[in-house]
Amino acid sequence: MILPSASEVKDIRPDDIETLAKLDASGLIVAPMENFSDYLIRIEGVMSFTEKVTTELDKSGHFELDEKIVLPAENLIPESIIEEAAGITVPLYGITVCWVPGFFLSQSLGILWGGCSYTDSENNLNLFLVRSSFATRKKWFVYRRDELISHELCHAARAVLNDHTYEEYFAYQTSPKKTRRYLGGCFRTRFDALFFLLPIMTLLIAQISLTIIGRNIFPIWPFWIASGIFPAFLLIRNHCERRHIHRAGANLRKAGISRVNAVLFRSLTAEIKHFAKLKDSQQLIKYINERVESELRWRIIHYRFIADGE
């Protein structure tokens, strides 16, 4: 998909819904309550950053992400590999993300590290890194290259919504594994992982201490209970949030909308939960039409996935 350069963005007209739909199809989603002029300013910034990366790679042979991470030009992920992700993201969410630079990274990696994305909306920074093992392999350890890249590109596309409840849910739907798709939404933030591991590590330390001492100087059962509380909370929360999104999807289908995942991918948590409550199809369509009248984001969603503008 050919995107406009930073200098060409300003030529897009407010009534050019087809071009706006193409930008959306490239993963350049309109932010909540973002108007047309602000959207173009942001897209111009995004394109400028992408062009900046290309220019620096051509000029100096590397791009400096920060003081510790310098990305050489030879580690730039080629378009042919990034395009593998489109086979997953197009049928799921109707996006082919080709504007986010990606690099293979090899230094200081843990055994479980597969990749990550960097997003800074204020500075229009969008970039992702994946393990260098994927430069020559389509699969490494428990990861598939197309799954991992599509996962990171989903984060890049949806970051503008600044809505974290379903962020990991949508990213993990790119996985072919049912277990990963189900459990992926459990960990929303770094604190979820921290509070998950902390009591488990405390239990391990307590158990090792008792083994070394050779006698029970304190009961171990409270540590077992503590280690199970937060994992249970994560599972229950994940189950409840999945029920909301599945009900929302069912109600959208009942209203005659077929590209349900694409619509929900661009929706906020409050909108998703509202869809879950609207069992009356007429009320649901009325709600969407009201959003279309007030938001550019929903105008494009309606054109692409509800009015069959594609």
Predicted segments with their positions:
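N-terminal leader/propeptide segments of preproteins
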Residues: 1-95
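Pan-zinc metallopeptidase signature
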Residues: 215-310
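Hydrophobic core of alpha-helical transmembrane segments in multi-pass integral membrane proteins
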Residues: 197-207, 228-234
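Juxtamembrane "helix exit" motif at the C-terminal ends of alpha-helical transmembrane segments
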Residues: 200-222
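Post-HExxH zinc-binding segment in Zn-dependent metallohydrolases
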Residues: 161-201
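Active-site scaffold of zinc-dependent metalloenzymes
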Residues: 81-82, 86-142
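Active-site recognition of the HExxH zinc-binding catalytic motif
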Residues: 143-160
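Membrane-proximal soluble helical/coiled-coil segments
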Residues: 2-19, 133-136, 287-310
